[in-house]
Amino acid sequence: MVDQMRRAASSITANVAEGFGRQTYKEKVQFYYHSHGSLNELKNFLLIAKDIGYLNQKDFDALAEQANLKHKILQGFLQKTKSLINHNSLITRKNR
């Protein structure tokens, strides 16, 4: 389970980085969604680790709080990037 958690955690940041490097907003959103999925996977593993006794409640709470903060940050990336897609679509339509 530790390896799966490490892979999920590294996938979060890797997908955000790849999204930042993409040229179009639609591509960025795609990678931010992949990052979001990896974060949900990690949160699931945290719950399992707590339930089977690998994590005590205090450690789980601290890690869950960090995961929830990361979730809010990712949601911000997604909302802002989606708004830029919509904004560009409106500009393109006006220029036709």
Regions found by a protein language model. Give the residues of each.
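Short, C-terminally biased terminal segments at protein or domain edges
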Residues: 1-96
